[in-house]
């Protein structure tokens, strides 16, 4: 087990609890990262929040509940060290990390070994989990890249906002591919298009330039932008018309709502998951702060009431093109003895990273016993996130840059309900936002029921094997 962050600590715990001896390697304090300040396992380097703990109405709260049912060390330590934060689960970061460290060091099956792993693990290491996070040391990152290919690791996260499709106003927007081009897997109407007049475009560019931006972290400042990853506000700074000759170009598209008027600019959204519930804003990676992002992007015609599954961002990161490189059990296709977990697999957030460490640990434990473990159902938060990592992205329609990007858990990753709720328990019809609330609650209830069934049918059977 390489890396004692959230994912690595959780994976080691799951393995040990399953009766498997684990050597947990951590390079700190011998080699520190630009962000860590201690050598303690599971140090929280940014926020102290695990976000919403509402399992009935929030996808990350649901993930909390699922992890608790699976005996998560990270959730146990978080619950024991929480601080007041309204409906969120926030923790005292030092006592949280200390609790994780105490549990790991006190487990008879876990050996915590300090020192940097500077290359691929030796061949005799037959069952390895690599969970070294977004700040993986350069020697190990180079070794992984050499084993895969040059484009397998991204060193600058270009994140465009992702919108829930059912919140886009299709009386203003429309489906069409540029020049009606039919690409691989496409239909010729694969993008959602939002038109702008000249006045709307002028106001939009002015808002981008004036919007408050997030500063780079100290360790990010020397990382260059890559071609194709420029923040949208940086493009706007290069010239007033730059965007309408770039990601907002209006050519090859006709607005069926007003076919005689040529839009001055067009914002395109591209399907982001196989289910078709999420669409990303093409070319809209940004360093705008979250508040200004929502305010500015909701001025786009058709997105006035948009709900965002994820807001945009641009920060240094190290993550794998997991759908290409990893199999369904998080093993590297090129060398299946190596399994990956945590943020480097393409999940965002503390809880998400720990949850992928949890499932990686369960997979590795089953493998160590000569057994196999079925994946958790895609209707669960754990299964939905795993599905995104190992294959939930789609190939780009026009051969553009791959669409796989790190993602927080959200209900857009889940399969739709067979039938959405329409009535309250008292029989009266649901109205407006009540429908959204009822839908989320139904998805959460389905997830926990399916997880309990999976635990009974697969996990206990695997544990007994």
UniProtKB/Swiss-Prot annotation:
Q: What Enzyme Commission number does this protein have? A: 2.1.1.74
Please provide the record's keywords in A-Z order: Cytoplasm, FAD, Flavoprotein, Methyltransferase, NAD, NADP, Transferase, tRNA processing
Cofactor dependence is on: FAD
Lineage, top-rank taxon, reads: Bacteria
The record ties this protein, via Pfam families, to: GIDA
Any one GO molecular-function label of the UniProt entry:
tRNA (uracil(54)-C5)-methyltransferase activity, 5,10-methylenetetrahydrofolate-dependent
Positions annotated to bind FAD:
3-8
Q: What are the TM regions of this chain, as residue ranges?
A: none
NCBIfam families named among the record's database cross-references: gid_trmFO (TIGR00137), PRK05335.1 (NF003739)
| Entry protein name | Methylenetetrahydrofolate--tRNA-(uracil-5-)-methyltransferase TrmFO
Give the source species.
Answer: Bradyrhizobium sp. (strain ORS 278)
Q: Which gene encodes it?
A: trmFO
